[in-house]
C-alpha cells in the first residue's frame, strides 16, 4: 500500500485522520492524485472516506485536477453508496467542466443524492446543484424548482440551506 494511503488508514469514520495533511501534500505534488483515486475505490470504508475528503479539499483550489478522473467520477465513483464518500463527491461533480449530456447526468446523480438517508449528503447535493446553476444559468429554472421542492419536504437543515441557496439563485435570475 502506498505511504499516502497508509497515512489515511486506520481508526473509524468519525475522524478525518490525516486528510488535511495529505491534501496539502497532493497540492504540492499533483501527480499523487492518482493514489487518492486508487484509495477511493478501496474496500476499506475509512480509507474511501478519507481519500474522498482529501480529493475534495485539493480540488477546492485546483478543480482542474479532477479532469483526468471525470469519466470515473461520473460512471463509477458517483455510484458509491457510502454517505461519507457521497458528501465529498457532490461538490467534486459541480467542479467538473461538463458537456450538456454530462451536465444532465450530473443533475440526475445529484437529484438522486437528495433522496439519500444522510441529511449531509442531501445538503451537499443541494449546494452542488446550485453551484452548477450559478455556472450555467440555463439550468436556473430547473434547479430552483428542485430546491423549492426540497425546502418543502426536507429536514430543518435542508430547509435552511435551501432558502439561502434559493435566495442566491433568485438574485442570479434577475440579473
State where each predicted segment sits.
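Alpha-helical scaffold domains
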Residues: 1-175
